[in-house]
Swiss-Prot record:
One of its GO terms (molecular function) is ATP binding. GO terms for biological process: arginine biosynthetic process via ornithine; L-arginine biosynthetic process. It comes from Neisseria meningitidis serogroup C (strain 053442). This is Acetylglutamate kinase. Pathway: Amino-acid biosynthesis; L-arginine biosynthesis; N(2)-acetyl-L-ornithine from L-glutamate: step 2/4. The gene is argB.
């Protein structure tokens, strides 16, 4: 046997040994995963994500996936001649855009994720927040530096989540894959930021962890250094000085709210890293940034 193969085998054995206490600790617990970024678009990362999710289920962890679909939505909007516009990280969504959002998220993207997981031996089931009306939504109005209460169309925030549907799937041994579309009081569809849905769902399921996959290493300071632990106070400072802005704002807000409201650990991790989920859950060092719910020192 070549020496490098021996080293590789030894490394694999060490990793398994390191993972064992975490497998024991987290077996039976719920982990909510916000799936987005490059991990959703690069073939190798997509396949790796599906395998990792199946592995989590095999060792007794209950993954619940909430997915985005920004690049796919943008591509479809461009095909029909509509240009995407964002306010404070939220997509402006008129009626025509909402039809496209629902078609892309609930149709193409959701089904592709479900198919990929099932290809690797999982039992994934795709659902939309409109199914059984389990995600109730209300219109989201945005405050900007120029104006308060900006109406950005059929964009919603989570009013309530009935977890019965998701819990039922978990009890049947399935992996729920949730498209972040909610339903209003008149039955109308609302586009909801996937980070918001993931955070609220993690709260309602009393999840052990909330993992948010991104295209960056985590939360960075102005000099580009990774901040591995953050308190709500520190995050407020980073927003005030402009370090955090745009699409990071709803992600950070959801992570903080989940941490404050009982999710045991919330993490922003780099979805470009192969096996990012396993590295965060099953290794001592973990990866990315952890959001603390209290006033602990960061």
């Amino acid at each position: 046997m070549a020496f490098e193969n021996i080293i590789s085998a030894a490394d694999k054995a060490r990793i398994l040994a390191e993972a064992l206490p975490y497998i024991r600790r987290f077996s039976g617990s719920v982990v909510v995963i916000k799936y987005g970024g490059n991990a959703m678009t690069e073939p190798a990362l997509k396949e790796g994500f599906a395998r990792d999710v199946v592995l989590l289920k095999l060792v007794g962890i209950h993954p619940v996936i909430v997915h985005g679909g920004g690049p796919q939505i943008n591509a479809m909007l461009e095909k029909v001649g509509k240009k995407g516009k964002f306010v404070q990280g939220m997509r402006v969504t008129d009626k025509e855009a909402m039809d496209i959002v629902e078609m892309v998220l609930g149709g193409h993207v959701n089904k592709e994720i479900v198919s990929m997981i099932n290809t690797y031996g999982g039992h994934a089931v795709g659902v939309s927040g409109r199914d059984d009306h389990f995600i109730k939504a209300k219109k989201l109005l945005i405050d900007t530096p120029e104006q308060n209460g900006v109406d950005i169309g059929q964009v919603g925030t989570v009013e309530s989540i009935d977890t019965g549907l998701v819990k039922g799937l978990i009890e049947r041994g399935c992996i729920p894959v949730v498209a972040p579309v909610g339903v209003g009081e008149k039955g109308e569809a609302f586009n909801i930021n996937a980070d918001l849905v993931a955070g609220k769902l993690a709260e309602e399921l009393n999840a052990e962890k909330l993992l948010m996959m991104t295209n960056i290493a985590g939360v960075m300071d102005k000099t580009g250094n990774l901040l591995t632990k953050l308190t709500p106070k520190r995050i407020d400072e980073l927003i005030a000085d402009g370090t955090l802005y745009g699409g990071m704002l709803p992600k950070i807000a959801s992570a903080v709210e989940a941490a404050v409201n009982g999710v045991k650990a919330t993490h922003i991790i780099d979805g470009r890293v192969p096996n990012a989920l396993l590295l965060e859950i099953f290794t001592d060092a973990g990866i990315g940034s952890m959001i603390l719910g209290g006033g602990e020192d960061a």
